[in-house]
Regions:
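N-terminal glycine-rich anion-binding loops that anchor highly charged ligand groups
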Residues: 9-23
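Glycine-centered flexibility motif
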Residues: 6, 60-61, 148
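Boundary/entry segment of secreted carbohydrate-active catalytic domains
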Residues: 1-10
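Phosphate/pyrophosphate-binding betaalpha-module
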Residues: 142, 146-162
Length: 163
């Protein structure tokens, strides 16, 4: 899996993408300017390699690569607190479905989410990206999140496992 430097493909990017050794592309904020630009970028990538896997980290909160023209998503800790306070057992699943639907609409195949670590305040990298400091809340919310992704048709990839 490779990444590219900007919002358009360079000749070097096109050459790399056409290599039989490249099977995936991950996109970041540096690759996003607008919904239309992103859609066209992905369309161009697929014209070079139809079966390439295109991925992103679109967790919500501070890890949301595409912001403008996409729904502003809270951190998973904020989402978990909201769901718990409002006794809304479907909120996390619905949120994941929404994120996934927006990504699928522009041509993204996989979202590297959810974070599966437990927020023990040991790492500033994880922090509010985790659903909770409670193991069962993390398990239940992560399961709901993955279900929402799958219902929308998005592949998931749990990351930052406990430890």
């Amino acid at each position: 899996m490779i990444d590219i430097d900007g919002v358009n493909l360079s000749n070097e990017d096109k050459s790399l993408l056409s290599s039989k050794h490249i099977g995936g592309l991950i996109l970041f904020s540096k690759n996003f300017d607008s919904y239309t630009q992103l859609y066209n970028l992905i369309k161009e990538v697929r014209s070079i390699k139809e079966n390439i896997i295109i991925a992103v980290d679109q967790e919500g909160g501070r890890v949301q690569r595409f912001k403008k023209e996409f729904t502003n998503i809270p951190s998973m800790q904020e989402a978990s607190i909201f769901a718990k306070q409002n006794d809304d057992h479907g909120f996390i699943k619905d949120l994941a479905w929404l994120i996934s639907s927006e990504l699928i609409a522009v041509g993204i195949d996989i979202n590297f989410a959810p974070v599966l670590d437990i927020n023990r305040n040991l790492s500033t990298i994880i922090g509010n990206r985790s659903f909770s400091d409670d193991i069962l809340e993390v398990i239940n919310n992560a399961s709901d999140y993955i279900d929402g992704m799958h219902e929308a048709g998005m592949k998931s990839s749990g990351k930052h496992f406990p430890g």
